[in-house]
Every structure is written in structure tokens, then in C-alpha cells.
Amino acid sequence: MRSGIRRSLLALLCLGLSQLQAAGQKTEAPRYPEQGQIVVHQEAAPNRDDANNAAQGMQTPVLGFVSSAEQGELRLLLGIPGASALGEPLAVPAGLRDLFFAPNQTYALLAPKAGDVLGLMTFQGVEEGAVASICGAIPQPDIVAFSPGASTAALYSRAEGRLQVITGLPGSPQLTRIVPGSDLPDEVQYLAVADDGVTLAEGTAHNAVYVLPQLGLPRLLYTAGDLQGMAFAPRTGDLVAFDRAAGTAFLLQDVEGASSYVLLADGLSGLDGNVFLQTSRAGAVIASTKSNSLWEINLQSLQAQNVPLPGMPQMLQPLRISGDFLLFFRTGLPAWILDSNSAEPGISFVPAGAAPSKHPRPLPFSTIHVLKDSQSAQPDLVSQGASGAACTGVPEPTPAPKPPPRTTY
């Protein structure tokens, strides 16, 4: 069924982007590599205005978005893996420090370099939406973890010494939980939040994995030799994690309940540098910045595949379709995309684009989202004007009461 859908989408893409083909240029149909090989679909660099116009007029599939916070650049990815093109830059607010895409790329959280307002930008089709200012949220989080379905985000700031959980994203954000740093078992290295918006796990700087119940003390689940990433599987309370010292990926099932350990794969070697771990409907993917291959794990069959790459990736960013990931993007160089939904994961290139011919005017933080404290009926924000002025007069939500001390027998 997927191959039929792929052929239909490819036919539509070729019709919508026919103006982008260089005269006489022949484009091979996309194909996926045999085991141990990398097949790259080469395309002529298209005209960006034509790409955006074709996408709007022909309903070309949107693969996702690519961004560079350092350059203030955000671009559309049109097409499907193996047949895709970059669009012209989209408008983003000026002065961004970080841009955190939700897993399905229907919205992103925007952290400013200065100021005390966290932004939220939604994406409808091929266009960016309005920018919302989420008053009361941590403005410059060090760690952001989304639930697999993207309706919940956990934010942590070392400078502020607190953790927040925001549910109802993107349309109705609500602050449902605040955890002071003093209530955390150790320095936060990783966070993971499940699709229920409640189940929350912390990976510490000393390689321990804890579940953080809403009521009760943090509970130790596992201690790894070198914890290098963790994420919940979609629609479950099961946590996938990677221990680089042991070369193992493992599953902690039902972390809020009895919790049990399941070995997913061992012998996962060569993952030096910064490690990325993501989950999707297709399984789990583990990659690193100093390895020219990655590991794909099927969570049902427990089969692990080593997938060769054309170089060392710089990210593992989920795209619009669950199981598609952006591995590399830099202006002037081809982008790399992983499609892990097929039996044999495929790597494809997006043609390198020239430097943007134009940049849209930066957007202001101009729309206000009501971010409510679930423990109080009082909204914790004050409206601001379109100039992007800081939120003022925002009452600090009251943290949940601490649980009684544990009795030792």
C-alpha cells in the first residue's frame, strides 16, 4: 500500500514541480538502497519561488521544514523522500536562540536570545502561522522534550532551576505541572514525557533513569553505564533508552506501574559524539554526530539494522510523517533525509540550494495564548501588544504540594 501511495504522491509532485526541472534534465524514479548500500536521488536545484507557488497551487505533499536558528532561516521541504525540493525562506521572529520543532512539525517553540517570553509558531500547509507568546512558560529552556504525539512538552531550565509540563499544545496550552529543581533527584540530562501528558521521566547526569510521579517521590527505574538518550514509545508508558557503555538499547515497560526491563538490541557500537534517540510508529532510531551509520530498531520484532550514511549527521529531527527524519541541513549543501518506514530504511538527498534570494521581514511576537495553571482558575498571563513587549504582572503558579517524607523501617 505504501509503495502505491508513494507512486501517487510522486506523480503529483512531478506534475506540480515540472517547471523546476532543468531543460533536458532526466530524473530517475526514487528507489531505496539494497542492504549495505546508499542510493541518493539527485535532482537539479529548483527555483524557490516556483517551488512555493507550485506547492500552493497543486497541493504538493509537504515533507516538513528545515531550520537554522543561527542564520534565522526556516524553509519548507516539498515532496517525499527521494523526490523533494527546498522552498524560499519563511518568516520567523528576529533574535532567536533556539527553535524546537514538535515531532509532527505542526508547530515549534521559539526561544529568544533575550527577553522573558517563549514563542509558539504554528504551520498550516506551506505557510507559517502567527507567533504566539506563551506567558509564564520558561523562555529559554535548556532541555525541551515533546510527547510522541506532540500535544505535551516538558521544559527545563538550569538557570531557573525548575521543570514545567505544558499540555494542550498547540491550540490550548496549559501549565499542568511545575517541579522545582530541589525536588528532582539529580541534575537533569534528559527528559521524556508520554502521550498521556502525565507520565514523566528524567535521565540524570549520573546515568540514572527516574520516573517523576505527580504525587510521590521520584522512583529509580534503572542505572546505566553511560545513558545517551531516552524517549517514550508512541501511545504507551514504555520508555526506550540507550546505554552507550553497554552498547544496548532497552525498554522500561509501564514506568508508572510495576516497570520491567526488556533488552531491545545489543552490540550497538560506533555511536561516539553527541547521540540522538527518537521514536516513531516504525520503531526507534539512534544516531550520533561522529558515526557514518545509524541504528534502526523495530520495537515489535526487536530487529536492529545498521544503516550506512553518506557522512556524519548533525541532527535526527522528525519530519511531518512519523518515521521520516532530517539528518543534515546546512545552507548551500544537500540535506539528508531518513525514511525508516520501509523494510529497508532509505537515505535520500534534497538538492543544495543557493543562498536565499530574499528574506521575509521578521515576525513579531504578536498573538497571545492563554496559558493557565491547572491548579487555579486564574490565567497566569497579562496581554501584551504586538510590539513583543515582555509579559508583566504574571503571577507565579503555585507548585504542587510536596509529598510526605518516606518512612524508613
Q: Where do the language-model regions lie?
A:
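A short beta-strand motif characteristic of beta-propeller blades
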Residues: 85-91, 129-136, 174-182, 216-222, ...
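Bacterial N-terminal signal peptides that target proteins for export
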Residues: 1-9
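Beta-strand-rich domains and repeat architectures in extracellular enzymes and scaffolds
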Residues: 38-79, 87-103
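Repeated scaffold domains used in trafficking and secretory/extracellular systems
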Residues: 47-55, 94-104, 137-150, 183-193, ...
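Short beta-strand elements that form the blades of beta-propeller/WD-repeat-like
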Residues: 61-68, 105-111, 151-156, 197-202, ...
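Bacterial N-terminal signal peptides
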Residues: 10-19
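Structural motif
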Residues: 71-75, 115-121, 160-166, 206-211, ...
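Short loop/turn segments that connect beta-strands within beta-propeller blades
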Residues: 80-82, 122-126, 167-171, 212-216, ...
